[in-house]
Amino acid sequence: MAEGRIIKALSGFYYVQSDNQQFVCKGRGLFRNKKITPLVGDYVEFEPKDDNEGYIMEIKERSNELVRPPIANIDQAIIVSSAVDPDFTTLLLDRFLVLIESKHIQPIILITKVDLLNEDQLENIKLYKQHYEKIGYRVELVSSKNQDLLPELEPYFDEKVSVFAGQSGVGKSSLINVLDPSLLLETAEISKSLGRGKHTTRHVELMKIGNGLVADTPGFSVLEFREIEAEELADSFPEFNARMHLCKFRGCMHDKEPKCAVKEAVENEEIAVFRYNHYLRFLEEIQTRKPRY
């Protein structure tokens, strides 16, 4: 039995990297019977059939996993937001952050296309950068067309498995192409009617960049909090986490309760109003969602 890691999944075949060799594998029927799907990023045991084929026999325990995109054992998520075309939106960025935080994955925020901004727009983006850095997030402003800005990003990938996430058309593929031009990933054109990119990435694949592995994932059209309960939502807002123990009532939802430390922090401008408003919006969404059967 050999061991390796799934680096690509395509049409029911799993490409397993084992040392310096790659095997094209199928999953055992047992996985289907147990409704277990091998994921890109999985560590597996497999039985080689010949020089480059085999069968996956066992999937090792996962440290974490995402459903959309379907990937496991991630060290960090690089959330890409464009400054313009499509326009920067903190609401969408916060949706990504909540989902990533709920999986206990380290987020990094990249805001792309800053070279397309005028001076006032750039100052506005820098203010948002300060807000997120105050929370504790790492934020970088980059242009995917300016290669001089990207070498400083390479240390982020060192010895880590990173997942790129973000609305389609924000520049994920362009960024990866600058980091490693040999990959030649197709870049998205922006739909003028929708204000978002057409999907260009059709499958999840781990690609070697420097000393790390990076997944360029399919663009998202829907971001839902299906796996997050209302009482868990505040845990995905780090600036709330630091104050929740000061709320008068245990189980405080930071909404209508009196003597709430989070609401006091908003009033004292210690927590950004836009972040709190997003929390309330997400909370209502979770509380009013239809049950799944």
Curated annotation (Swiss-Prot):
It holds the Pfam family RsgA_GTPase. It is found in: Cytoplasm. Transmembrane segments: none annotated. Residues 63-223 form the CP-type G domain. InterPro entries: G_CP_dom, NA-bd_OB-fold, P-loop_NTPase, Ribosome_biogen_GTPase_RsgA, RsgA_GTPase_dom, RsgA_N. GTP binds at T112, K113, V114, D115, G166, Q167, S168, G169, V170, G171, K172, S173, S174. Keywords: Cytoplasm, GTP-binding, Hydrolase, Metal-binding, Nucleotide-binding, Ribosome biogenesis, RNA-binding, rRNA-binding, Zinc. GO terms for cellular component: cytoplasm. One of its GO terms (molecular function) is metal ion binding. Binds 1 zinc ion per subunit. One of its GO terms (biological process) is ribosomal small subunit biogenesis. Its cofactor is Zn(2+). The keyword Nucleotide-binding applies. Zn(2+) binds at C247, C252, H254, C260. Its EC number is 3.6.1.-. One of several proteins that assist in the late maturation steps of the functional core of the 30S ribosomal subunit. Helps release RbfA from mature subunits. May play a role in the assembly of ribosomal proteins into the subunit. Circularly permuted GTPase that catalyzes slow GTP hydrolysis, GTPase activity is stimulated by the 30S ribosomal subunit. PANTHER family: SMALL RIBOSOMAL SUBUNIT BIOGENESIS GTPASE RSGA, SMALL RIBOSOMAL SUBUNIT BIOGENESIS GTPASE RSGA 1, MITOCHONDRIAL-RELATED. Monomer. Associates with 30S ribosomal subunit, binds 16S rRNA. HAMAP family: GTPase_RsgA. This is Small ribosomal subunit biogenesis GTPase RsgA 2. The gene is rsgA2.
